[in-house]
Amino acid sequence: MTQHSRDTPQFYLTAPSPCPYLPGRHERKVFTHLVGNKAGELNDLLTHGGFRRSQSIAYRPACDQCRACVSVRVIANEFKPSRNQRKLLARNADIVGEQRNPVPTSEQYSVFRAYLDQRHRYGGMADMTVLDYAMMVEDSHVQTRMIEYRKRTPDTGITGRGGELIAAALTDVLGDGLSMVYSFYEPNEQHRSLGTFMILDHIARARRLGLPYVYLGYWIEGSKKMDYKGRYLPQQRLAPSGWLRIDASGEMQPEPQD
């Protein structure tokens, strides 16, 4: 009995709370703990089923009478950037991405704090302290990386190191893709569209690693905060019948792909 309870994940349901994305609605989540030697394997399995990771917790929406949150993953090797996205990549050609272990730094927190203060001042993460940030980065029992984005310097070509930190993405490496857990950027660099740039960079990284997907989290039709995730096509969206393909034309394939 003890062995069974240790190896079998236990799931819990949160109490209803106001939905941060759709006004007038309430959200509930089902969650479990990601701990132990099989945390990575469980995280892969749950991500395929529409869960997201936050520290050592895997969760997914379980709202009463609402299924607006739809898990999306970009098909990396088929993705072709649009004309505007190609311009954006060219605009940010002076940025170098550096993959690191998930170790929090004061430099990261400074950018993170500026991002929250300007972009999400009244959000649920607005009061996060430096210790809260450290927990967000370090509390992972799966294969996690921190991708730092820095401006190139005259020495970058020699050292491989960039200069000023302007963005970062906490990213899980799954068996079939990259999952963007949380990303943030310097708000004074708004002209760079760094949020879009980081997604495009992750698609390129997944392709180089031979990984088929980039998991973006939840797309919510009608939510301005989440609508952008539908722009990266082709992609797959999780339906009750399985993952459904959305072509570059925006048309949905009727058959699940998995």
UniProtKB/Swiss-Prot annotation:
Recorded catalytic reaction(s): these are: N-terminal L-glutamyl-[protein] + L-leucyl-tRNA(Leu) = N-terminal L-leucyl-L-glutamyl-[protein] + tRNA(Leu) + H(+); N-terminal L-aspartyl-[protein] + L-leucyl-tRNA(Leu) = N-terminal L-leucyl-L-aspartyl-[protein] + tRNA(Leu) + H(+)
Main localisation: cytoplasm
Q: Which GO terms describe its biological process?
A: ubiquitin-dependent protein catabolic process via the N-end rule pathway
SUPFAM superfamilies reported in the protein's UniProt record: Acyl-CoA N-acyltransferases (Nat) (SSF55729)
Q: Which UniProt keywords apply?
A: Acyltransferase, Cytoplasm, Transferase
Instruction: Cite a single GO MF annotation.
Output: arginyl-tRNA--protein transferase activity
What Pfam families does its record include?
Answer: ATE_C, ATE_N
- Which compartment or compartments is the protein found in? Cytoplasm
Disulfide bond annotation, renumbered to this chain: none
Q: What is its EC number?
A: 2.3.2.29
GO cellular component terms, semicolon-separated: cytoplasm
Q: What's this chain's function?
A: Functions in the N-end rule pathway of protein degradation where it conjugates Leu from its aminoacyl-tRNA to the N-termini of proteins containing an N-terminal aspartate or glutamate.
Q: What is this protein called?
A: Aspartate/glutamate leucyltransferase
Originating organism? Rhodopseudomonas palustris (strain ATCC BAA-98 / CGA009)
Gene name linked to the record = bpt
